[in-house]
Amino acid sequence: MKIKATIERVPGGMMIIPLFLGAALNTFAPGTAEFFGGFTGALITGTLPILGVFIFCVGATIDFRSSGYIARKGITLLLGKIGFAALLGVIAAQFIPDDGIQSGFFAGLSVLAIVAVMNETNGGLYLALMNHMGRKEDAGAFAFISTESGPFMTMVTFGVTGLAAFPWETLAATVIPFLLGCILGNLDHDLRDLFSKVVPAIIPFFAFSLGNTLNFGMLIQSGLLGIFIGVSVVILSGSSLFLLDRFIARGDGVAGVAASSTAGAAVAVPYALAEANASFAPVAESATAIIATSVIVTSLLTPLATVWVDKKIKQKKRRTPPPKNQMTIN
């Protein structure tokens, strides 16, 4: 049976399908984890330890010896995405109450949802697009983009902008697994190869356990809003990253558009932040549902936008004559 191939036909399927299965279990049999307990219960409710292993393995994929072009590209896209999310968060905080919007089309929307949905890029999608287009050096920026996975960067964003405070112990506890992974991955490339293979394999496990914090009612309620947010992510972050890629990273903008998505791992961020700061607890569930929808939407739209921009740039290059000093005289 081609179970994996079938799941991957759904955009972000290895994250979204287990998430929905977990939500189904929590909706129709909410006491399952307590009933079985033991290893089964831990598999259902163990989001944080599973996420800790994921962050460690992501850290192990980072190569400190990346070329200058790859480093410039990766850092530009990384800081650009985080900076844009921070800016939107600061603006949104002026209008959205701490417990989120309670009525109307935007019911359930919170500053947490906005920052988390904008803050993380689907690194796997970016890597696939760049490799498909034959952009090997641009693909190398994946290592930097992947550092957005997990709650740490979102915690930093909230802390730096003053939107929320986290104890230094919490920040340290979040980043230590990542740093340990970085160190081991650079000390031994065999360990990097070993742990890098774990990254995609562990995603369904924390997605399933995370799904057990949701229910179908909230997922259905956030549907249209989640679609709107997903479209906004592609348009807003795609435009800003396109400009940064062209004028800072000295690229043609295509890689920037390819980074205009929401990572599947972002679905875990509201829960993790609520565990670290109880003020996020009232909006964590609705934020998770919005982000889950955005993951699907951006997984569909980001490739279309990337291909469209790449096509337009190639057409422009074909129409532009070479400089006179490069023209040959017969």
Curated annotation (Swiss-Prot):
Per the record, what are the reactions this protein catalyses?
2-dehydro-3-deoxy-D-gluconate(in) + H(+)(in) = 2-dehydro-3-deoxy-D-gluconate(out) + H(+)(out)
Q: How does it sit in the membrane?
A: Multi-pass membrane protein
> Chief subcellular site?
membrane
Q: Where are the transmembrane segments?
A: 10-30, 42-62, 77-97, 100-120, 140-160, 163-183, 200-220, 224-244, 254-274, 289-309
Database matches in Pfam families = KdgT
Keywords in alphabetical order, please. Answer: Cell membrane, Membrane, Sugar transport, Symport, Transmembrane, Transmembrane helix, Transport
Give compartment(s): Cell membrane
Q: Which GO terms describe its cellular component?
A: plasma membrane
| Cysteine disulfide partners in this protein | none
What stretch or stretches form a coiled coil here? none
The induction annotation reads: Induced by galacturonate and negatively regulated by the KdgR repressor. Is subject to catabolite repression by glucose involving the ccpA gene.
Q: Which GO terms describe its molecular function?
A: 2-keto-3-deoxygluconate:proton symporter activity
| Family statement drawn from the similarity comment of this UniProt entry | Belongs to the KdgT transporter family.
- Listed NCBIfam families: kdgT
Q: Which HAMAP family match?
A: KdgT (MF_00070)
Question: What functional role does this protein have?
Answer: Catalyzes the proton-dependent uptake of 2-keto-3-deoxygluconate (KDG) into the cell.
What is this protein called in UniProt? 2-keto-3-deoxygluconate permease
Name the source organism: Bacillus subtilis (strain 168)
